[in-house]
């Protein structure tokens, strides 16, 4: 399959080069495009192209890049707009159309659930129906497989109600060797079924996952050639022990590693953590990381960390925690009541400092991901990450604070995530780029106006300045609103069996 796609891409590249060599007149008269985008400032972070160009799109692919306008029955005038590769979100818990809608309006064309993952992979995305708003995919969710093996009634309850009690046996009880072997068998089957790596929620299972189980996971990842996407075990502010643990296991096993939401885990130690990651990369460890540009964490109130010394860990108190769905600020009494009566409920614990975020995003190769929370409807509030992560970076860190160049920010939102995935999922070789033969996953935004409008008080507000979003060549957002055409997303799986 990959070889056929490669031949097609090469053919498209040569065809477009031949057409462009004839001059603008030949392109406008002879080329048959489904859609053209004219007069835009095209930024491709891989080739470093940053210039006025026009794009020709056919069958979901970019087939022409021209210095002069192109002509077709359908066109977009991108005057005054930046044309960028569609954004790839490696870390989102959006599991339903309502969440995907928010991310699409924020410029995300590929939504991936890689930290927690999914199980079974074959059923991931079925709730999205036949026309998903964005491309999507998931890693193999170790936690859910662990629940299947150790506490099957709990996973059945998740399937019935969607509610997860993280104080149950699967999140607190170490596995014996027989259980580890069963977890391994199911995980291998799920990787063979297309899982995009392995999702490992170590911090949520601090007491549960012992060294043999952890080492089994990393050894499997190395054998299959996929990364482990890990939420590291958490210590007090800045403690690097959780990072050092997974770096050592990755180096010993040869597994690829991705550290989720570094700013939220490292806290004031972001520089030290990134120095350790850079040192590991220099030794040959394949390790990457990400951050989100918000200042609150979000977790189920039954999470293991809230059974530990969480006030010392986060350096906050009960009054810094909100009940996510209503925005209620908690007291010790209401916190403990919710722990008993609503163990599935989400909190927003406000402990992240803007300074940590700025220090993280200023370092090379740190990607951006939303860590958006599950959202079945708009009746219950969640953190605003899903509605305003990409646009917050573009508005705040690029335009207002000038911490990043526009091209650098676009790379962290598109190219770098594609490069993290493409070694084991070949579909990503055509994403995160504006090049002939690349997928026509594109965003068009006004760099002078783009900004997140969502907030903790109003988490569902669509951003400003995000004018068009194309998914597979389909105009899915037009003039900042969902279009009638939206629904061109496809499921993405690994390509381990294609070679």
What residue spans do the PLM features occupy?
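Active-site neighborhoods of metal-dependent hydrolases
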Residues: 148-209, 247-251, 256-406
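Flexible loop/turn segments at secondary-structure boundaries
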Residues: 95-96, 119-121, 144-148, 205-209, ...
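Charged helix-capping and loop-helix junction motifs
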Residues: 211-216, 242-245
């Amino acid at each position: 399959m990959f070889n056929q796609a490669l031949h097609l891409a090469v053919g498209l590249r040569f065809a477009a080069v031949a057409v462009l060599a004839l001059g603008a007149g030949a392109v406008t008269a002879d080329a048959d495009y489904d859609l053209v985008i004219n007069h835009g400032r095209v930024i491709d972070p891989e080739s470093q192209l940053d210039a006025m160009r026009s794009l020709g799109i056919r069958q979901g692919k970019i087939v022409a890049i021209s210095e002069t306008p192109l002509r077709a029955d359908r066109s977009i005038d991108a005057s005054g707009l930046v044309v960028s590769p569609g954004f790839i979100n490696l870390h989102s818990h959006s599991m339903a159309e309502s969440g995907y809608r928010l991310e699409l309006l924020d410029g995300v064309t590929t939504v991936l659930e890689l930290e927690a993952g999914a199980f079974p992979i074959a059923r991931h995305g079925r709730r999205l129906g036949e026309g998903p708003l964005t491309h999507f995919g998931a890693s193999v969710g170790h936690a859910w497989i662990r629940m299947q093996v150790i506490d099957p009634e709990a996973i059945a309850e998740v399937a019935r109600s969607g509610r997860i009690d993280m104080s149950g046996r699967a999140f607190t009880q170490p596995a014996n060797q027989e259980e580890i072997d069963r977890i391994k068998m199911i995980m291998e089957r799920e990787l063979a079924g297309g899982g995009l790596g392995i999702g490992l929620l170590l911090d949520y299972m601090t007491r549960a996952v012992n060294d043999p189980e952890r080492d089994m996971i990393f050894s499997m990842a190395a054998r299959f050639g996929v990364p482990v996407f890990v939420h590291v075990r958490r210590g007090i502010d800045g403690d690097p022990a959780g990072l050092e643990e997974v770096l050592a296991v990755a180096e010993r096993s040869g597994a690829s590693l991705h550290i989720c939401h570094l700013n939220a885990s490292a806290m004031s130690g972001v520089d030290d953590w990134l120095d350790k990651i850079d040192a590991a990369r220099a030794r040959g460890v394949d390790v990457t990381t990400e951050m989100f540009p918000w200042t609150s964490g979000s977790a189920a109130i039954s999470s293991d960390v809230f059974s530990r010394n969480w006030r010392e860990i986060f350096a906050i108190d009960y009054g810094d925690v909100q009940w996510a769905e209503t925005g209620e600020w908690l007291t010790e009494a209401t916190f403990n009541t919710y722990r008993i009566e609503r163990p599935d409920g989400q909190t927003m614990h406000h402990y992240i400092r803007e300074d940590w975020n700025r220090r993280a995003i200023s370092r090379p190769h740190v990607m951006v991901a939303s860590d958006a929370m599950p959202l079945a409807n708009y009746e219950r509030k969640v953190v605003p990450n899903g509605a305003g992560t990409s646009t917050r970076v573009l508005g705040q860190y690029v335009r207002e604070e000038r911490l990043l160049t526009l091209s650098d920010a676009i790379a962290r939102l598109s190219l770098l995530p594609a490069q993290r995935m493409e070694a084991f999922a070949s579909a990503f070789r055509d994403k995160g780029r504006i090049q002939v033969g690349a997928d026509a996953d594109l965003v068009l935004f006004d760099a002078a106006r783009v900004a997140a409008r969502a907030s903790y008080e109003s988490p569902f507000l669509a951003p400003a300045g995000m004018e068009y979003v194309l998914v597979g060549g389909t105009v899915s957002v037009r003039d900042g609103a969902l279009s009638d055409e939206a629904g061109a997303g496809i499921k993405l799986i690994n390509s381990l069996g294609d070679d």
